[in-house]
């Protein structure tokens, strides 16, 4: 029973730990006169992906790589179909030109790249299905290309990064926040992974299934709440771009760094999940083509949500 309580508490620790670490590091950055633009692109962007990253690294070193891979792929499907679906039902979501013509195609390319590298044995590159250290470095290379693009776009929209956006605290308090954040991330990640393994064994489910569903939804909850609240406030200008950017971070940064630290065994059953990400990303493009305007309408959001429910049913059937 305790392990399931810690499993739930682990998600809280992960999310709050990332928040504390970002607040502390951002405060120190402001004290050192680092620009709000750089803080937003580095500390905040990387900090918000820390829960998924810690889960992946801990799962990998605990010999449960299926949890990590499932978490990344499941989060990407949930980001598009669940988060954008619910948000669009609340309020139609505009898609910016950069998101439509650059970021969504880049996300599709990243998904195809992960699929190609993971299935390298089919092409005679190796004898086993694994995302190797070299593959991880390739993913990181493309990630830093994407980061360069984000930097260029952000400089053009520099006015969006307010100097007052990040709270400045005393240095001791900032350090305490960072230490507490690191502790929360570590113990939260540990409890989530341990709980997932125990749950999989008890209910006779695969670790991959747990990663694709419960952990993926759990680590996506902050984005879901933020996007839903923004939709209620009609503040949805960059909602789609944020989700697509998060998917690129997951595929290139989290999988890339995790594989560089320790090669990740890959189960070919994940190919159907990669296909689902490709289909979801393609649906984003079709939403504009079918609707004849750059927006995800309410009925398209409903379609996304139904597709996600169907995907969960498919995963339950697959086991």
Identify the function of each model-found stretch.
Residues 1-319:
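Hydrophobic alpha-helical segments, chiefly the membrane-spanning helices
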